């Protein structure tokens, strides 16, 4: 017998800064569904997850709690593992970056990269965001705050070791271009290429001296290894990679990884930083990195003060494990963010699980017991409608496989539930209760119930990857296809008002003083204009190809802006917010048909669009996605 093909799947490791909410939990459930499905196809699956446990943020949180960082991460890692287990995830390895073998291997990897000239010592000066553990230049900040999370940043300067990213950039670009499946979805690949790789990579800071909670650089112990060479190496250390000798059999068997599942917010680290580290180590790159969308709270951002944070264990208490698994897997689009709320959970449970699935199984098992004492055989009394049910049943596994190969897990689940819906329609078409009234149609009735049991069983077997407990319960009720058990309710319908009342008892809203929202500004309204007035203005995307300060002015910059095939000179009062050097290369939004005028004696042929906050800070309006110079703004 030939060996089973291997399949190595990983999630990002969870940061141990606090209890994960349902949005954090989605990723592990998604990975589990894929891992289970691959096992059902005969793959030898190795599924790794774990926790990221070092960093300044954890050091500060431990200090606030009055405990050591290790005590702090032990508590949080234990809670994360408890929730992963609660969600019935079938991981094979749970790695912690505080594990001794991981820390030792990270030190060896750091030394190897240093010895071969990929890492060097220097100084880092910039703005630092503690929650994101990232440095930024002034020009990268958004309104003076972290461009990733929007929180305040602090100036920082420290000695650090750097990795020569540019040394491998061209090689990575070539790899991505020749391996279109490497970064998925395609929109994430385009983002990485256009926003990071093609503009050029800066060398990456890979050590810190301003905090101690990390893996020491053994040949320079005042430094600790920064997150990039720590957390991002777990995917190889967890399966026994050794950079200075023979790696373990588990690594040799499973590397390169077949699939890395990570959130879209950290795809840059996993598709640029980590592949370059692997190239430097002489290792092949993973076959695919999938940046999944986010699961968002239905009524806005999750906030403890509003009492609207959704945690997996609390959802499980209300709905059960498989109902929660079903929702997060079924409601997440392939690329766009999904939404979750108590109301949506109740609606989906009642509609899909209690009605479509639960009612189908209950009716089928009940009728089999009522009319045949729980035992049926195929009497072969067929009608045309049977052929369609059989065709749908046989085609569903093919459709599911196609969707799973594309990582369209929600669509795969839809195909399974389409089969269950077809079974319900089959009941309406064949009307077993009417057949039961005619003794001459007894064999036809038994054939109908036999067909139903076979089709539902086929769907239940497919459902195992997504809802393992429910699959097991259905197959147990349906027995071996001949003898069924007594019917049991799979999912109870819920009343939304009762659920919300219990939720309010569990999480009463916290009264807090109303504070001015710094992200909202009210300005005095101007008189309304007509569509005709607005239509007179022409807005286009422009690219700044040159910029210089306007002499004898403290406020003005003069930019040469390429708009389509023409270049316009535009003078703007933004000198206090941008340097001339920063402006060059920016894509901006331009009012192009503004009547030319002179500012400080310099001709200006248009206007750059900016936003201004309450403190007078300006930010240029730029396209959200790459757009060509000259593109119309409409």
Q: What do these predicted regions represent?
A:
Residues 116-169, 173:
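Cys/His-rich short segments
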Residues 471-533:
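Intrinsic disorder at enzyme termini
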């Amino acid at each position: 017998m030939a060996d089973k093909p291997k399949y190595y799947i990983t999630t990002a490791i969870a940061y141990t800064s606090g209890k994960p909410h349902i949005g954090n939990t989605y990723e592990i459930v998604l990975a589990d569904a894929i891992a289970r499905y691959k096992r059902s196809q005969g793959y030898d699956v190795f599924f790794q997850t774990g926790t990221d446990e070092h960093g300044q943020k954890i050091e500060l949180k431990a200090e606030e709690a009055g405990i050591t960082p290790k005590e702090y991460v032990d508590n949080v890692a234990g809670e994360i593992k408890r929730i992963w287990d609660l969600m019935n995830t079938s991981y094979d390895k749970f790695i912690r970056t505080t594990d001794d073998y991981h820390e030792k291997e990270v030190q060896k990897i750091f030394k190897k990269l240093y010895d071969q000239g990929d890492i060097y010592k220097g100084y880092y000066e910039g703005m630092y965001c503690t929650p994101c553990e990232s440095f930024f230049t002034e020009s990268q900040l958004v309104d003076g705050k972290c461009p990733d999370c929007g929180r305040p940043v602090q100036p920082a300067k420290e000695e650090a070791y750097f990795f020569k990213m540019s040394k491998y950039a061209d090689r990575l670009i070539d790899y991505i271009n020749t391996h279109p499946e490497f970064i998925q979805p395609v929109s994430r690949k385009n983002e990485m290429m256009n926003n990071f790789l093609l503009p050029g990579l800066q060398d990456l800071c890979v050590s810190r001296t301003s905090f101690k909670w990390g893996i020491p650089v053994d040949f320079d112990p005042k430094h600790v290894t920064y997150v990039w060479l720590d957390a991002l190496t777990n995917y190889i250390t967890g399966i026994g990679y050794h950079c200075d000798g023979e790696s373990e059999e588990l690594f040799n068997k499973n590397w390169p990884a077949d699939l890395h599942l990570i959130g879209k917010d950290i795809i840059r680290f996993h598709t640029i930083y980590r592949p370059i580290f692997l190239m430097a180590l002489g290792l092949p790159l993973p076959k695919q990195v999938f940046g999944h969308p986010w699961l968002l709270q239905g009524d806005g951002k999750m906030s403890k003060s509003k009492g609207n944070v959704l945690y997996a264990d609390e959802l499980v208490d209300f709905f059960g494990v498989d109902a929660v698994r079903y929702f997060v897997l079924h409601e997440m689009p392939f690329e766009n963010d999904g939404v979750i709320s108590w109301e949506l959970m109740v609606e989906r449970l009642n509609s899909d699980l209690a009605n479509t699935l639960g009612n189908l199984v209950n009716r089928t098992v009940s009728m089999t017991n009522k009319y045949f004492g729980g035992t049926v055989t195929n009497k072969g009394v067929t009608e045309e409608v049977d052929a369609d049910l059989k065709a749908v049943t046989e085609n569903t596994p093919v459709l599911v496989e196609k969707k799973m190969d594309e990582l369209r897990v929600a669509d795969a689940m839809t195909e399974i539930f389409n089969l269950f819906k077809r079974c319900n329609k089959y009941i309406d078409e064949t009307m077993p209760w009417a057949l039961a009234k005619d003794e001459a149609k007894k064999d036809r009735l038994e054939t109908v119930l036999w067909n139903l049991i076979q089709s539902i069983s086929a769907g239940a077997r497919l459902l195992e990857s997504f809802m393992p407990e429910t699959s097991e319960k259905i197959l147990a009720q349906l027995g071996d296809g001949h003898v069924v058990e007594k019917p049991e309710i799979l999912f109870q319908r819920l009343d939304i008002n009762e659920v919300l009342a219990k939720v309010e008892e569990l999480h009463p809203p916290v009264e807090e003083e109303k504070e001015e929202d710094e992200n909202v500004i009210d300005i005095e309204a101007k008189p309304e204009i007509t569509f005709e007035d607005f239509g007179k203005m022409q807005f286009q995307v422009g690219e700044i190809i040159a910029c210089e300060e306007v002499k004898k002015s403290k406020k003005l910059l003069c930019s040469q802006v390429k708009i389509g095939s023409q270049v316009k000179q535009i003078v703007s009062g933004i000198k206090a917010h941008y340097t001339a050097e920063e402006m060059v290369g920016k894509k901006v939004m331009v009012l192009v048909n503004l009547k030319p005028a002179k500012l400080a004696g310099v001709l200006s042929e248009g206007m750059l669009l900016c936003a201004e906050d309450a403190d007078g800070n300006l930010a240029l309006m730029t396209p959200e996605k790459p757009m060509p110079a000259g593109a119309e703004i409409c």
